[in-house]
Amino acid sequence: MIDLKLLREDPDAVRRSQQSRGEDPSLVDALLAADAARRAAISTADTLRAEQKSASKSVGAASPEQRPALLARAKELAEQVKAAETAQAEAEAAFTAAHLAISNVVIDGVPAGGEDDFAVLDVVGEPTALENPRDHLELGETLGLIDMARGAKVSGSRFYFLTGKGALLQLGLLQLALRLAVENGFVPMIPPVLVRPEVMAGTGFLGAHAEEVYRIEADDLYLVGTSEVPLAGYHADEILDLSAGPLRYAGWSSCFRREAGSYGKDTRGVIRVHQFDKVEGFVYCTPADAEAEHQRLLGWQREMLARIEVPYRVIDVAAGDLGSSAARKFDCEAWVPTQQTYRELTSTSNCTTFQARRLSTRYRDGGDAKGKPQIAATLNGTLGTTRWLVAILENHQQPDGSVRVPEALVPFVGTELLEPVGPRG
C-alpha cells in the first residue's frame, strides 16, 4: 500500500506515478474521496458513541420524571450508533479497496512507458558470435541435460526433466548463488512454497496478475512463483531491530507460474516454464537505506553473471513494466545467440514500504526499544535460476556440439566439458 501521508500532502506525485505506469490517475482521486469518507464516518461514529455513553450515565442519575425521555433518547442513540458503525465498516471497506487499487509510487528517474521503454545502464562483454549456433534445447537434448518430451508426457506443456549433468549444472549454479549470498551476510533459507492468501496479497501478487498464480482451492493456499513471497511474510506483523543494518535472507525454492498470459510465447525449451528453481535474495531495511541496498543487490547479481561468463546488459525497467509492488526494478539480461537478443536472467526490485505496509512489518526508529515503530522497506533480487541454463549452454557451446562449463561451476558438475551422449531409455 502507498503511504497515506504522501497521498494527502502530495497527491500530484501519486498521479504522476500512475500516469508513468500507464495506469488510471483518477484512482488517486477515488482514494482521496474514500479516505475523506472513511475519516468522516469514523468521526461520526465516535461522536455518537460518546453521546450514547453520556446519555447512559444521565439515565442512571435522572429523576423518575426525566427518565422516560432519557431512555427514549438512549434508544435512539443506540440505533444511530449501530447505523454509524455499519456506515463506518462500509467506508473502511471502500477505502481499503481504493487503497489496494493503487500501485507503488515509482522512484524519480524511472523511465516512463511500457515494456520497450527501458533505459540501458551498462553493457558487459561482446555478444557471442557463432556460426550456425544451436539453441539451448537442441544442446540440452544432445548432451543429455534436458528432456522436454518426457516432461510433457508426465505433466503437460512447459514441464521438463533436468537429467544427468543438467541436474548437476542447475544444482551447482544454485549452490554457487547461495554461497555468494552467505559470503555477503545473507541467512540461507528453504521456505515453504505454499502460502496463505493474506501473504500472497500482501506481496502484491493477487492484483492484476492473479491469474498467473496456482491456487490449491481445497486448502485455500497458493503455490509461490518466487520465494520473495514467503520471505516477505516471514516478518509479517513484527517489529524488527534494524540497528545493526539490513536483514538479508536468501531463499532456495521451487517456483510455480501458470504463464496464463503467455500463450504462444517462448514455447520451446526452459525459458518460460510452469516450474523452476531459484535462489532469491530478500532484504528488510530502513527506507533511508533502500536505494543503496538496491545497488548492492544489483552488484551481487552482476558478480554471479561474471562467474558464469556470459555477456549481459543492465536495464532500468520502465514504469509501465513494473509489478505493482516495485518502485524501481533493474534487470540483467544475458545475450542469447540463437535469438540474437538479450533475455532477462535477473531482476531486482526496490519495493520501498509498499509490501511491508500491507504486511505490517515495522522497525524501531533508531533501534531504541522505546522508539516509535516505522514501516520497513523491502527489496528482492534473483541470484540464480533455471533460466540461466539457457545463457550458459548457448554462449559456451563449441563447434563440435559440446559445451564448455564455466570455471566456477566445474567443481559442481565434475567436468570441464559437456559432450554429446548416446540414446538412453
Curated annotation (Swiss-Prot):
PROSITE patterns: AA_TRNA_LIGASE_II. It is found in: Cytoplasm. One of its GO terms (molecular function) is ATP binding. It catalyses: tRNA(Ser) + L-serine + ATP = L-seryl-tRNA(Ser) + AMP + diphosphate + H(+); tRNA(Sec) + L-serine + ATP = L-seryl-tRNA(Sec) + AMP + diphosphate + H(+). GO terms for biological process: selenocysteine biosynthetic process; seryl-tRNA aminoacylation. Its EC number is 6.1.1.11. Pfam families: Seryl_tRNA_N, tRNA-synt_2b. ATP binds at residues 257-259, 273, 344-347. The keyword Phosphoprotein does not apply. Keywords: Aminoacyl-tRNA synthetase, ATP-binding, Cytoplasm, Ligase, Nucleotide-binding, Protein biosynthesis. Its main location: cytoplasm. GO terms for cellular component: cytoplasm. Pathway: Aminoacyl-tRNA biosynthesis; selenocysteinyl-tRNA(Sec) biosynthesis; L-seryl-tRNA(Sec) from L-serine and tRNA(Sec): step 1/1. L-serine binds at residues 226-228, 280, 382. Catalyzes the attachment of serine to tRNA(Ser). Is also able to aminoacylate tRNA(Sec) with serine, to form the misacylated tRNA L-seryl-tRNA(Sec), which will be further converted into selenocysteinyl-tRNA(Sec). Homodimer. The tRNA molecule binds across the dimer. Consists of two distinct domains, a catalytic core and a N-terminal extension that is involved in tRNA binding. Belongs to the class-II aminoacyl-tRNA synthetase family. Type-1 seryl-tRNA synthetase subfamily. This is Serine--tRNA ligase. It comes from Mycolicibacterium paratuberculosis (strain ATCC BAA-968 / K-10). The gene is serS.
